[in-house]
């Protein structure tokens, strides 16, 4: 007589495992701006390369309806060797305008190779943000967007110590999205308080000295036609 076989199905929920559900809320204004890009008569055919910060840009772009008609590829060459492989050389310093422009150029070439044609757009973003232990130098990012028209660049210096790492990353993602939008002829809306689209407040109530540092933040933007 064959032995009887039994099976038990165990279903574990996140709550049973003690795992807290992460918030999936995405900034509505960022999604609206991404949607504006996708609704263009000729939406950009985007390849993006991001390292060091600004990775929150990926879910903002990909969670917006219409992404499949515009986003070709989004990559994060985070390791030094990975970035060197993308650029074709190992830069002595990875967070500067030249690296951002090289990343944008490689991304643009990739978009062309994937069939983007005249709508090909390449975005490069490199950043140095809050870390543990605290970083010695400035918290900053460099963003470049390459299109058939030319190269749009943004250099942004953040107020050191005013934000969490997550908030700094969101600022960089916003700056990248705003630069991309302007390169495509879409003006990003200002924040409700009248500040630039990329700017975010500190996680905690702002002390006067923190507010002053945030007010002192600056961004330098340039465009060079091809």
What are these regions, as identified by a protein language model?
Residues 4, 54, 216-217:
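Glycine-centered flexibility motif
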Residues 4-21:
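Terminal signal-anchor or tail-anchor transmembrane helices
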Residues 24-198:
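Short alpha-helical segments enriched in small residues
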Residues 188-226:
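Non-catalytic propeptide/linker segments at domain boundaries
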């Amino acid at each position: 007589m064959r032995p009887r076989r039994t099976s038990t199905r165990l279903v574990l929920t996140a709550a049973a495992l003690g795992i807290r559900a992460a918030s999936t809320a995405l900034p509505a204004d960022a999604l609206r701006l991404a949607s504006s890009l996708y609704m263009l008569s000729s939406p950009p055919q985007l390849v993006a390369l991001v390292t060091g910060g600004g990775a929150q840009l990926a879910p903002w772009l990909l969670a917006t309806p219409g992404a499949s008609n515009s986003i070709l590829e989004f990559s994060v060459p985070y390791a030094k060797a990975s970035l060197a492989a993308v650029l074709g050389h190992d830069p002595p310093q990875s967070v500067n305008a030249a690296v951002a422009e090289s990343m944008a150029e490689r991304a643009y070439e990739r978009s062309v190779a994937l069939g983007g044609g005249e709508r090909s757009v390449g975005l490069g973003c490199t950043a140095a943000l809050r870390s543990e232990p605290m970083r010695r130098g400035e918290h900053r990012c460099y963003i470049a967007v390459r299109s058939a028209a030319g190269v749009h660049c943004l250099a942004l210096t953040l107020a050191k110590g005013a934000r969490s790492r997550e908030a700094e990353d969101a600022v960089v993602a916003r700056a990248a999205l705003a630069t991309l939008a302007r390169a495509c002829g879409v003006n990003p809306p200002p924040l409700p308080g009248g500040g630039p689209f990329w700017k975010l407040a500190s996680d905690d109530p702002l002390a006067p000295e923190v507010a002053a540092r945030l007010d002192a933040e600056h961004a330098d933007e340039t465009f060079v036609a091809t």
